């Protein structure tokens, strides 16, 4: 059992945002069949958003992708249709200004155990770095409305440690690190971007080392509660993120690449590693920073 911001999780493995469609049937099937400690919803906004037109997703190399769905989602109202599901639900919320976050959060019911504020999407204008100028205001307003733990999802920017500090000082209960890294690919036949949006978020194994560095630096400065996300493809990757400060580890691209069965593989791999070392998972957290 792992306690994060007062919430108990069976083990460190959760599903990151953007993977599981926000429908009761799909979520319930994933919960029952694969037993993740929690599912993080797709980012939901107050009003529905249309996704960018195709192509929105392209494979860069083995275990590495570029995507720009553009936060397409049915809106926060879908939450009332989810009902009770048998694993914990973390709701990801997005917006282009403070009021949109407030409006969306005001619609949240008792289903989620935690709220994740996505202030770092690189794939829709006005929904990413522009939010950082008022991250404190977003956090303070959300915390004044909800009693659930609030985590802030940040991207791998150069000033990430400073921004993390601002979010925590404003009252965030923890951080989700990291979001995707903005990139671009060009078609050499017509010399236009391959993705319809132009740029996209780089995800997968190619950002794992970046995630390790960011989590390390933020944990070293503040020792906050962290959900670590970024290129986790096996139990070693998960242990690595835990060793630099993550309490929970989110799986994303690996589920696209290998399917949901990998959840069990990674969980069992962590268990075997800990048993062989004679360690508990809490003894590993942050050890790579403190040594």
UniProtKB/Swiss-Prot annotation:
Top-level enzyme category: oxidoreductase
Keyword Oxidoreductase: yes
Textual note on the cofactor: Binds 1 FMN per subunit.
Amino-acid positions noted as binding FMN in the UniProt annotation, renumbered to this chain: 17, 42-43, 118, 153, 178, 204, 230-231, 252-253
Active site: 121 (nucleophile)
Cofactor: FMN
UniProt EC number: 1.3.1.14
Keywords: Cytoplasm, Flavoprotein, FMN, NAD, Oxidoreductase, Pyrimidine biosynthesis
Residue positions binding substrate: 42, 67-71, 118, 179-180
GO CC annotations, alphabetized: cytoplasm
Compartments, as annotated in UniProt: Cytoplasm
Keyword Transcription in record: no
Residue runs in coiled coils: none
Pathway(s) this gene product operates in, as recorded in its UniProt entry: Pyrimidine metabolism; UMP biosynthesis via de novo pathway; orotate from (S)-dihydroorotate (NAD(+) route): step 1/1
GO molecular function: dihydroorotate dehydrogenase (NAD+) activity
SUPFAM superfamilies from the UniProt entry: FMN-linked oxidoreductases
Reaction equation(s) it catalyzes: (S)-dihydroorotate + NAD(+) = orotate + NADH + H(+)
Family label: Belongs to the dihydroorotate dehydrogenase family. Type 1 subfamily.
UniProt cross-references to NCBIfam families, sorted A to Z: dihydoor_dh_Arch
Function field: Catalyzes the conversion of dihydroorotate to orotate with NAD(+) as electron acceptor.
Stored PANTHER family: DIHYDROOROTATE DEHYDROGENASE (FUMARATE), DIHYDROOROTATE DEHYDROGENASE (QUINONE), MITOCHONDRIAL-RELATED
Subunit annotation: Heterotetramer of 2 PyrK and 2 PyrD type B subunits.
Entry protein name: Dihydroorotate dehydrogenase B (NAD(+)), catalytic subunit
Organism of this sequence: Sulfolobus acidocaldarius (strain ATCC 33909 / DSM 639 / JCM 8929 / NBRC 15157 / NCIMB 11770)
């Amino acid at each position: 059992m792992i306690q994060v911001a007062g919430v108990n999780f069976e083990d460190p493995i959760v599903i990151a945002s953007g993977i599981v469609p926000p429908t009761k049937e799909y979520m319930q099937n994933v919960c029952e069949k694969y037993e993740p400690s929690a599912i993080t919803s797709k980012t939901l906004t107050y009003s529905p958003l249309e996704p960018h037109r195709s192509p929105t997703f392209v494979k860069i190399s083995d275990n590495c992708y570029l995507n720009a769905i553009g936060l397409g989602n049915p809106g926060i109202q879908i939450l009332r249709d989810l009902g009770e599901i048998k694993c914990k639900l973390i709701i990801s919320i997005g917006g282009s200004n403070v009021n949109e976050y407030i409006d969306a959060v005001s619609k949240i019911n008792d289903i989620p155990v935690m709220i994740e504020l996505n202030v770092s999407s690189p794939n829709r204008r006005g929904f990413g770095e522009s939010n950082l100028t008022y991250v404190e205001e977003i956090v303070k307003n959300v915390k004044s409305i909800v009693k659930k733990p609030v985590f802030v999802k940040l991207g791998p920017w150069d000033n990430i440690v400073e921004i993390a500090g601002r979010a925590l000082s404003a009252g965030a209960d923890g951080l989700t690190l990291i979001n995707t890294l903005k990139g671009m690919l060009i078609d050499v036949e017509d010399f236009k971007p391959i993705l319809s949006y132009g740029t996209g978020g780089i995800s997968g194994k190619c950002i794992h080392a970046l995630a390790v560095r960011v989590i390390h630096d933020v944990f070293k400065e503040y020792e906050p509660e962290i959900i670590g996300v970024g290129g986790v493809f096996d139990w070693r990757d998960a242990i690595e993120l835990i060793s630099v400060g993550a309490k929970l580890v989110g799986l994303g691209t690996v589920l696209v690449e290998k399917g949901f069965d990998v959840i069990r593989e990674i969980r069992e791999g962590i268990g075997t590693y800990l048993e062989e070392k004679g360690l508990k998972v809490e003894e590993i957290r942050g050890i790579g920073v403190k040594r």
